[in-house]
Structures are given as C-alpha cells and as structure tokens.
C-alpha cells in the first residue's frame, strides 16, 4: 500500500497537536489529550488487525474501545505529558504506516468485519477491505481529528 497520504495527514495532526494554545472543547467534547489518545487507540487496533491478516488469522475491527472515556483517560495517564503522548502517537503511526507499506495486494484486500461508531451513531457495520480501513484514516479519520485540534485553538482565541 502507498501510505504517502496517511503520513502527510499525520504530520498535519502532529503540527496541530504541538500547539501550546489548545483549550477545551466548547461543546464538552474531547480535549487535545483525549483526541490524541483516541488516535493512538485506533492506530494500535488497526495495526493489530493488519498484523493479524499477515499472520493468517481473520481479525475484526471495532472502534468502540477507542471511544470509551475510561480507556482514553487511561492512555493519557500512561504518559508524562502532551509531548510524551504526541511522541507515542507518532511512533504508533509510523508502525502502522510501515506495516501498511509492506502489505501484499492480497492481504490489503482481505475483508475485515468492522463496526465503526462516531458521535454515538453507527457509521459502518459490515466487512471492509483492510486497505479501505487504512485509507479511511488518511481520507477521514486523521483529518477530522486534526480539525478538532485546530478548533480547540479557535476556542482559546474566542475566550481571550
């Protein structure tokens, strides 16, 4: 697989996350650390799915654990601060991209039973090719969370 777009999307996320002017979500949504923890959780799960396919098993993907507040807080607490968390997300993103770079055409076309929720709504409940799961990170998931981080900057400016 070609991960150029995904790597580029991550770089934009890391630039946004490194800002020192990130406030709280005005709508009670996730703060910057929770957004990063969510991305880390999703990336680790998709990397595990990809490695499972390579090993010959047929894993599934369910993003509900990456939406769980307790799990996100656990991930945040495991880090010494935002820089440490960003470093871990960066490392996990690199691992995921490196795995994807080495997937064969056959492996990337394996259908993965998937359940995806977003904002408490079911987005997907059907098999999706592994490549589609990974490409969805670049096309939607990472840019959406990058925008969330940028919106946290705007929230600070509005309250200044």
Positions of the model-derived regions?
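Structural signal for well-ordered, non-membrane alpha-helices
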Residues: 10-18, 43-51, 90-104, 146, ...
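Glutamate identity and glutamate-enriched acidic tracts
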Residues: 11, 24, 68, 98-101, ...
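Short, helix-capping/interhelical loops that line the mouth of catalytic, cofactor-
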Residues: 1-4, 45-95, 156-160
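Helix-loop segments that flank and shape redox-cofactor active sites
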Residues: 11-34, 55-61, 102-126
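Alpha-helical scaffold segments that form or flank carboxylate-/histidine-based iron centers
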Residues: 1-6, 22-42, 72-88, 115-141
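A hydrophobic membrane-anchoring alpha-helix module
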Residues: 135-160
């Amino acid at each position: 697989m070609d991960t150029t777009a995904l790597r580029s999307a991550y770089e934009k996320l890391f630039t946004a996350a490194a800002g020192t002017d990130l406030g709280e979500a005005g709508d009670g949504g996730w703060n910057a650390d929770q957004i990063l923890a969510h991305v880390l959780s999703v990336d680790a799960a998709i990397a595990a799915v990809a490695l499972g396919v390579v090993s010959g098993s047929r894993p599934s993907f369910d993003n509900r654990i990456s939406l769980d507040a307790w799990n996100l807080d656990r991930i945040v607490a495991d880090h010494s601060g935002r820089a440490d968390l960003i470093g871990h997300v960066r490392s996990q993103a690199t691992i995921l991209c490196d795995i994807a770079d080495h997937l064969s055409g056959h492996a990337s076309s394996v259908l993965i039973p998937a359940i995806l929720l977003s904002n408490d709504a079911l987005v997907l409940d059907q098999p999706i090719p592994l490549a589609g799961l990974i490409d969805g990170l670049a096309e939607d998931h990472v840019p959406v969370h990058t925008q969330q981080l940028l919106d946290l900057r705007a929230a600070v400016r509005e309250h200044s």
